Design a protein with these regions (language model features):
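Zinc-dependent metalloendopeptidases
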Residues: 1-241
């Protein structure tokens, strides 16, 4: 089983002072990749890319308004799609190439055995489970990854005047990282600002090294830096990141 991004954490309350790190540090690229069919485009022209489909089978309790989750997914997947020639991403309601879900430690054995695990994913491997991603919903997901007052999360455990802060995790950063694995990238240890760096760094945009690696697998889309920056800033502005 190809599991990634097992996060070390000894505090079940996920104290904001604990450093999180990803444990699988291989840097070679995976031997398999997505090869979706390139169907006809408008007016019968041949598209030079294919769609990798995805769906969310179980949503996060931290985003009761699914629009936040939808935006996070769109930002993460579109950033990869803007940089690749061969693939785009499309959300579906039925059978999908990549299935994403949120589960807590009561529902997922790995999260019970390793309570500090933030998420795990499978490489594309030609099998049904290839590309699937599971996020630990026992941790606190937010739009910005900043510490949050404990009373806001656990009003039954903390008093309104508590000064206790709990660590939260940026949903877009984690989606970007896990989606990188789901489309074939392993960790990068050389550049600490990379999305695929093996330590959680909260970055919400692709580093040039991330781009070079994914384009070595799926080709370069060829959009100008100005256009890419425009779409990226527009997406992040709507998200609030």
């Amino acid at each position: 089983m190809s599991i990634f991004c097992i996060v070390k954490d000894n505090d079940e309350q996920f104290d904001c002072n604990i450093d999180m790190d990803f444990s699988y540090n291989a840097i070679e690229e995976w031997k398999h990749k997505w090869q979706p069919k390139k169907a006809s485009g408008r007016k019968g022209s041949k598209r030079n890319y294919g769609y990798v489909t995805y769906r969310v089978t179980n949503e996060s309790k931290h985003f009761p308004n699914s629009k936040f989750e939808d935006k996070a997914l769109a930002i993460a997947l579109r950033q990869w799609g803007l940089r690749t020639q061969d693939i785009r991403f499309k959300r579906v309601t039925g059978t999908a190439d990549i299935e994403m879900k949120f589960a807590d430690k009561q529902d997922d054995k790995l999260f019970r055995d390793k309570p500090g695990t933030l998420a795990y994913a499978y490489f594309p491997n030609g099998q049904k489970i290839g590309g699937d991603i599971t996020f630990n919903d026992s941790v606190i997901w937010t739009t910005n990854g900043k510490p949050i007052n404990a009373y806001e999360v656990f009003p039954d455990k903390y008093k309104p005047n508590t000064k206790t802060k709990l660590r939260t995790y940026n949903m877009v950063h984690t989606l970007l990282h896990e989606c990188g694995h789901a489309i074939g990238l392993k960790h990068c240890q050389q550049h600490k600002h990379c999305i695929m760096y093996p330590y959680y760094n909260g970055k919400v945009q692709l580093h040039d090294h991330d781009v070079q690696r994914i384009q070595s697998i799926y080709g370069a889309r060829g959009l100008s830096r100005r256009i890419i920056d425009y779409f990226r800033k527009r997406m992040l502005r709507k998200w609030g990141g």
